[in-house]
């Protein structure tokens, strides 16, 4: 299965910059699956600019409710209508800045699945939690609280909703720091074991992305690690050439 390279633009990007970015991606054939998650207002313009290129689009959050009197919230159904196929949920910046709990992330994931979106559920520990030896415990608790039953096929018998996990150590996001390869491999193995326990057969194959200061210079070594099914890329996804370089590193794996 090709690795997934997902770009999280966060609150960056402009309408004026869409054309050049899309032009760089359109002819590319890196061998990895590409997903770009721009700010919600840019999803439809970027979709149009990509002009059918094999690049999926995603959102960075969605609301628990599908519609109604919820000022400022993002409807999962509307995101799908705009062209999104995926949605990032539970990113550490959302958990910290908006006090989102794992229970809220779980409800958002249910809503996303109902709207036909694939949830990318983020987990990760702080520097203090890693230093105190609690990293795996914290991440397992986030998984236990954030993953809906739909991902195990427990809601509609025989129907397993697709989902993706993204492990992002909080202290590595945007800092230029990355954990050691041994630490990444150990955490991904721990996540895989937790997914098997929690989701059964579905958990054995669910992709686990690594995120946190992924860049062209370290992508190949990170993407070659066991149980790393791709990358959730932040700052490096804002430049098409860097994003494609990371995708090319995945293809060489």
From Swiss-Prot:
Task: Write the Enzyme Commission number(s) for this entry.
Answer: 5.3.1.1
Q: Where is the active site?
A: 91, 168
A single GO cellular-component term from the record reads: cytosol
Per its record, the protein catalyses: D-glyceraldehyde 3-phosphate = dihydroxyacetone phosphate
> Could you confirm whether the keyword Isomerase appears in this record?
yes
Q: Which residues bind substrate?
A: 8-10, 174, 213, 234-235
Q: Which domain of life is it from?
A: Bacteria
- Per the record's keyword annotation, is Isomerase included, yes or no? yes
**Can you state the subunit structure given in the record?**
Homodimer.
Instruction: Report the function annotation for this chain.
Output: Involved in the gluconeogenesis. Catalyzes stereospecifically the conversion of dihydroxyacetone phosphate (DHAP) to D-glyceraldehyde-3-phosphate (G3P).
Q: State the name under which the record lists this protein.
A: Triosephosphate isomerase
The organism of origin for this protein: Acidiphilium cryptum (strain JF-5)
Q: Which gene encodes it?
A: tpiA
């Amino acid at each position: 299965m090709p690795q997934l390279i997902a770009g999280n633009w966060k609150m960056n990007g402009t309408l004026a910059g869409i054309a050049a970015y899309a032009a760089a991606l359109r002819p590319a054939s890196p061998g990895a699956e590409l997903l770009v998650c721009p700010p919600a207002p840019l999803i439809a313009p970027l979709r149009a600019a990509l002009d059918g290129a094999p690049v999926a689009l995603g959102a960075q959050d969605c609301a628990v409710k599908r519609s109604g009197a919820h000022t400022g919230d993002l409807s999962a159904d509307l995101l799908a209508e705009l062209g999104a196929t995926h949605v990032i949920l539970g990113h550490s910046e959302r958990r910290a800045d908006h006090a989102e709990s794992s229970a809220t992330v779980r409800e958002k994931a249910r809503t996303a699945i109902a709207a036909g979106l694939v949830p990318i559920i983020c987990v990760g520990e702080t520097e203090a939690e890693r230093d105190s030896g609690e990293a795996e415990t914290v991440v397992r608790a986030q998984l236990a609280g954030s993953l809906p039953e739909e991902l195990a096929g427990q809601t509609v018998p025989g129907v397993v909703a697709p989902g993706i996990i993204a492990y992002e150590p909080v202290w590595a996001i945007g800092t230029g720091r990355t954990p050691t390869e041994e630490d990444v491999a150990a955490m991904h193995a721990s996540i895989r074991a937790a997914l098997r326990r929690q989701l059964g057969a579905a958990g054995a194959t669910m992709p686990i992305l690594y995120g946190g200061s992924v860049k062209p210079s370290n992508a190949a070594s990170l993407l070659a690690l066991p149980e790393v099914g791709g990358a959730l890329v932040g700052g490096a996804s804002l430049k098409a050439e860097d994003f494609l370089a990371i995708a090319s590193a995945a293809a060489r794996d």
